[in-house]
Amino acid sequence: MVKRVDLRITGHVQGVLFRHGAREKAQEFGITGWVRNEPDDSVRIMAQGPEDTLQKFIEWCRKGTEWARVEDVEIKWGEATGEFRGFEIQ
């Protein structure tokens, strides 16, 4: 089933190529959506795809790039809207 997930990743996740790594992994998995840095030093991701694939993507987000130090991943599930055509860095 196609789902939508809203993620907020906290820790040392800005300035460590986290967004670029997330985009690369999302494209590899065929996930659509976006990733952006937030003013509170977190990273936010809105992603859509098959639920099992999103679970794998979330597991990657728990680790991030080799330079990242992820402390927490907040997860909010929702219904897919089909609004995204690719995966972008905002």
Segments and roles (model prediction):
Residues M1-Q90:
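Intrinsically disordered, low-complexity, mixed-charge
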